[in-house]
A protein has these predicted regions:
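N-terminal glycine-rich FAD/FM-binding segment characteristic of electron-transfer flavoproteins
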Residues: 2-301
Length: 301
């Protein structure tokens, strides 16, 4: 956002929406916001697309921004398009690069699991984009920065809502979260069994800030729980290193990991698509490759 604001010579505004979020405005300013619009109401205690769409749209109508950015998170990828419809404008989703061309946003995103890149322009304002997680370096907080905070009231007519919040259940997982892991070890259906898949956890004992993940096929085969699934129907991650083990590299899976800085493939099929997607690859049976690799790691340790 800071780079775009500099190119446009415009301030950075942040909308804080939720319940009890007023105290977070100083954090937003420290991270680069010039002005923070706070929508603090108990109706926003839990995310509901309808209420948040109204809030974002009403703030946008008051502020009249040229660009609106949201994270391409499970909530963001639902919220972004609904806000675009509300404001009658366009949106680019899951973007990995943002530039200013002729005073308007030009967004780049991956297609077909990273096989293609698409550039999207916008004919009217506001330009809306959801941003792929970890596509940009995070800002370092600067507590000396000053900014302005304004409380905004929005009108959410509860009688018009077609949905309601029921409950929130958080998946319990051991160790570091997939979204926070710098190294991810992902196993596919080619692992063959739950016992084979469980062997991947030996990596996490040797590599710091690492986590185990799965493909949809491995999860459907009950090698692990769905909370580990990466891809279109799972989580989107962008680690520094992504081990793709015994998986084919289908576009549906690559959509969740194509933002990885380095992909290391291990597959006994030399024609597997994953080798086209990876920076490094080993052709071989994972049952022979992984023990040798782990032995080398232990020697380094």
């Amino acid at each position: 956002a800071s780079g775009l604001a500099k190119d446009l010579n415009e301030p950075i505004s942040v909308a804080l929406i939720g319940s009890g979020v007023s105290s977070k405005s100083d954090d937003a300013i420290a991270l680069g916001a010039d002005k923070v619009y706070v929508v603090d109401d108990s109706v926003f205690e839990n995310y509901l697309n309808e209420t948040y769409t109204v809030a974002v749209a009403q703030v946008a109508e008051q502020v009249n921004p040229r660009i609106i950015l949201l994270g391409h998170t499970p909530n963001g990828r639902e919220l972004g398009p609904s806000v675009a419809v509300k404001l009658e404008t366009g949106i680019a989703t899951d973007t990995t690069s943002l530039d200013i061309v002729d005073g308007k946003l030009e967004a780049t995103r991956s297609l077909s699991g990273g096989l293609f890149r698409q550039k999207t322009g916008f004919p009217k304002f506001p330009n809306i984009a959801t941003v792929h997680p970890k596509s940009f370096d995070g800002a370092e907080p600067d507590s000396s920065r000053s900014g302005e905070t304004e409380t905004v009231s929005v009108n959410v007519a509860s009688g018009d809502l077609r949905s309601r919040f029921v409950s929130h259940t958080e998946a319990i997982s051991e160790g570091i979260k997939l979204e926070d892991a710098k190294v991810i070890i992902c196993g596919g259906r080619g692992m063959g069994s739950k016992e084979g898949f469980d062997g991947l956890y030996e990596f996490t004992g040797l590599i710091g800030e690492s986590a185990v993940a799965s493909t949809r096929a491995a999860s459907d085969s009950e090698f692990c729980g769905q909370e580990l699934m990466i891809g279109i129907t799972g989580k989107v991650v962008s680690p520094d290193v992504y081990f793709a083990i015994a998986l084919s590299g289908a576009s549906q899976h690559m959509a969740g990991c194509s933002g990885s800085k380095n992909i290391i493939a291990i597959n006994k099929d030399p024609e597997a698509n994953i080798f086209k997607e990876s920076q490094f690859g080993v052709v071989g049976d994972y049952q022979a490759v992984i023990p040798a690799f782990l032995d080398e790691l232990k020697q380094l340790d």
